[in-house]
Amino acid sequence: MRKILKLKIGREDLILETGLLAKQANGAVLATYGGSTVLATVCCSDSIRENLDFVPLSVEYNEKYYAAGKIPGGFIKREGKPKDKEVLVSRLIDRPMRPLFDKRFGREIQVVPTTLSTDQMNPPDIVGMNAAFTAVFLSDIPFNGPIAAVRIAYLNDEFIVNPSFDEIQDSVLDIVVAGSLDGITMVEGGANEVSEEILLDAIDKAYTYIKQICDLQKEFIYLIGEREKLPLAYEEKVFEFKDDLRSLIYFELKDACFVRGKLNRDKAIKLVKQKAYEHFSSLEQLNDENEILFYKACDDFEQEIVRKSILEDNLRTDGRTPTQIRDIIAEVDLLKRTHGSALFTRGETQALAVTTLGTSIDEQVMDDIDGDKRLNFMLHYNFPPFSVGETGRLMTGRREIGHGHLAQRSLEAMLPKKDDFPYTIRVVSEVLESNGSSSMATVCSGSMSLMAAGVPVKEQVAGIAMGLISNDDKYVILSDILGEEDHLGDMDFKVAGTKNGITGFQMDIKISNVTKQLMRDALEQARIGRMHILSIMDSVISSSRGDISVNAPKIVQLQIDIDKISLVIGSTGKTVKAITDEFEVRVQIEQDGRITLFGTDNLKMQKAKAKIESIVREPKVGEIYDGIVKKINSFGAFIELTPTKEGFLSNRSRSRDDRYGSDIRHSRYSNRHSRYGRDNRSSFSMRFPRLEEGQIVKVRISDIDKFGKIELELARD
């Protein structure tokens, strides 16, 4: 049965519809906001897997080109593998939804939001999020919903709910907030040095509308009736001999948890578990069914030990206090032939960033339903398996794309405008070691490598990952969390920024009782930590170098009138090709008359610039040129002043420096005098040798008539 509900959110109505499309799915919702429409479906498999310690969820957001009235570019006219944007939106949908599924359900779950229409004004990602959340909530899959999402922008000192693409582009803050009726579950976005209070107010603003959308979803239950949920695959089980296991390993496991060094600590914990496993095996108390429960009980003890130590003793497994940051080492210029390089090491997390400068030809072309784009800044994050001491495939996964995007957003607000710095910039982060917060280490190393490459960034940027351990009575906020603190904790909050404010952030919350005061405390503790990190980075490199690397391509720009573009290009590109070949430069001509020269030799680039300026320059009487003799006849010579301009040097014209002789003496007159065997050359002919085609001669413009014809005379040195 078709049901439709709508709610005013910002400038448009959010329309949710179910019962018309994809009725064989476990759940399906069509969401529309303005002219953007997304269909989201959810299905689960029939096969059941017991004792899973994770939710087998996959989210596959996809955009159809027909949604914008386009046909895919390139040779293949079918949508192919997911684009980075689709991966990022899939992660936005996945992260707030995953904790609300019951692990005991034991079946694979697939959520597929598909953009069917877009007005290229209202971003379809936020529409897809609400479509997916509603589809899952209305399905027969056990889910602790409802949840909803809202985007907030801050522009001209005002908050805008679900802003347009143009408003996002002009804003100083762009965040996506997801949450339930119980509280915020996820925040992600970028900013241009905004304060912590503005961020908190934006989250507050978003939550007001999130609750309204959640209530709208609940209205569907009254309209269509609550569906009977599918049964859980298994009941929660515990290890039968858990008390005996606690008595056997608890204190030994506690000692192992506080061994210094990630690898040593993991090895010590593994040894304790192995000894316990052998003990229970010898008593024949382990079998295939309860072996998983045995290891789960060990993990529960480990989590209890770590959390209790932090809450009661303010002591973390590596010996730090909650606010303490690991030792930091920062270096630049490790790689001599690169354009800029930096190494940032924080404890057992290490990121090597390399900046490469290219030309506009190196820009990333994006064929997108929201409009074609060219990106002149890219950050690529690589997380090889050796960074955590493991083997595996070297490939770019969703995690790498997501972490790279967060680091890129954190840095891009500090980059110069393209008109001021017309380079394409690529930063590659190689994570060489990882024990928590590698994306924030990427921000730090990336910022320093940009400065080392000579990119005129506005401010240094640093990042830090915050964590949370809480119970019913108290909470402890952790600075610079380890990997295990991320796994065992209640919150992962990454904050990047400058000394002036925040530029990037990502928060995932696993509990429902996070208050505004808690977030304020976390942001303030993150700000203090960020200032500490910035001070260390500034001691190594505090501002961009005045010049770019000698290994980077050089750029020279000039502006010409639009109506002169054709002169620079020439017939069939002849002129611009000649400039390219002669001076070994690459020439890019924009429609607004801006010309950019790329090359490696400064002298040749300046000569190429002078050549172009001479081509477009309007000739004036009295100007002197080094012209090329193109053709000679009995009346004089045609002299090429520039590839697009010629003048005529008459044999009757007189030089300003010689009133008695003609400027040109044609060869036949010379031969006539020589027939008599004597040199009858006049004084002026001896002073001015014969001109030959191809000869370079210095000439002066003596006159320009009303038709633009140029008359020349020889110019004396």
Curated annotation (Swiss-Prot):
It is found in: Cytoplasm. The keyword Cytoplasm applies. It holds the Pfam family RNase_PH. InterPro entries: ExoRNase_PH_dom1, ExoRNase_PH_dom2, ExoRNase_PH_dom2_sf, KH_dom, KH_dom_type_1, KH_dom_type_1_sf, NA-bd_OB-fold, PNPase. GO terms for biological process: mRNA catabolic process; RNA processing. Its EC number is 2.7.7.8. This is Polyribonucleotide nucleotidyltransferase.
